[in-house]
A protein has these predicted regions:
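Cytoplasmic membrane-interface "Motif A"-like loop-to-helix N-cap segments
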Residues: 94-105
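Flexible cytoplasmic inter-helical loops of multi-pass small-molecule transporters
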Residues: 3-22, 218-225
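C-terminal ends and interior cores of transmembrane alpha-helices
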Residues: 106-123
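Intracellular juxtamembrane helix-capping segments at the cytosolic ends
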Residues: 141-154
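Hydrophobic core of transmembrane alpha-helices in multi-pass small-molecule transporters
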Residues: 125-141
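A late C-terminal transmembrane helix in Major Facilitator Superfamily
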Residues: 151, 156-188
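Extracytoplasmic gate region of multi-pass secondary transporters
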Residues: 31-80, 174-179
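Multi-pass alpha-helical transporter architecture, strongest
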Residues: 2-3, 149, 200-225
Length: 225
């Protein structure tokens, strides 16, 4: 399907610009944007992995739900989260990317600990679902627009490596280790420390959101390097 799609006008224009500079060398001209990708991704990917991959273990090991209950709750929450994505994307088209990211950051810092603490002590699948759904209403401020925000940071002809390299490294470090960090704290008898860790990661990203430009209003998507 990808091979039959038409390229965008910006990409076709970029193909006309022939340069011998390597992609990595070109990327070195954008250190600020690379750091922005890392900063805006760290908290969001940690939160995303918490409420997707780790949540199944959390519901079984900490909440005490059965396998069937865990499956129903996590699947229902994922469907709810999927529904939110285009809605939040539409909101960002109206108010800008930055404000939606800031909303995620502020709400994540304020409500991550209360949500996870309450979730740990619920007694059934329905309240568990409602709490995870509330978390998705926060996390979707990041997940719904993170890809387009990163794309809007870089000119067309280096966008793939500009987004892909720092994003992949950040997801591996902060997203891929979520389960290990959470279970590590649990094995030490301090499971709640993970809640503070996650809040701290979101807080770091919030600082980035506060000082970055709104990429909807100032996009590099149609520029050439």
């Amino acid at each position: 399907m990808r091979r039959t799609l038409h390229e965008t006008d910006a990409f076709e224009a970029a193909r006309q610009v022939v340069k011998r500079t390597s992609s990595l060398r070109a990327l070195l001209k954008y250190p600020r944007e690379v750091l922005l990708v890392v900063g805006l991704t760290a908290g969001g990917t940690a939160a995303f992995y918490t409420y997707t991959t780790y949540m199944q273990k959390f519901l079984k090991l900490s909440v005490g739900l059965t396998d069937d209950q865990t499956t129903v709750v996590t699947l229902s929450a994922l469907v709810f989260g999927m529904i939110l994505q285009p809605i939040y994307g539409g909101i960002s088209d109206r108010i800008g990317r930055k404000w939606l990211l800031i909303a995620f950051g502020v709400c994540g810092v304020l409500f991550t600990i209360p949500i996870l603490t309450t979730l740990q002590n619920v007694k059934g699948p329905l309240p568990a679902f409602l709490l995870i759904a509330a978390a998705w209403m926060i996390v979707s401020g990041y997940t719904s627009i993170n890809a387009v925000v990163k794309a809007e940071l870089f000119p067309t002809n280096i966008r793939a490596i500009g987004v892909g390299l720092p994003y992949a490294l950040t997801v591996s470090i902060f997203g891929g280790t979520t389960d290990s960090v959470a279970l590590g704290f649990k094995s030490l008898g301090h499971e709640t420390w993970f809640y503070y860790y996650l809040t701290g990661m979101i807080g770091i990203s919030l600082v980035v959101y506060l000082f970055m430009r709104d990429t909807k209003a100032d996009s590099a998507m149609h520029r050439l390097e």
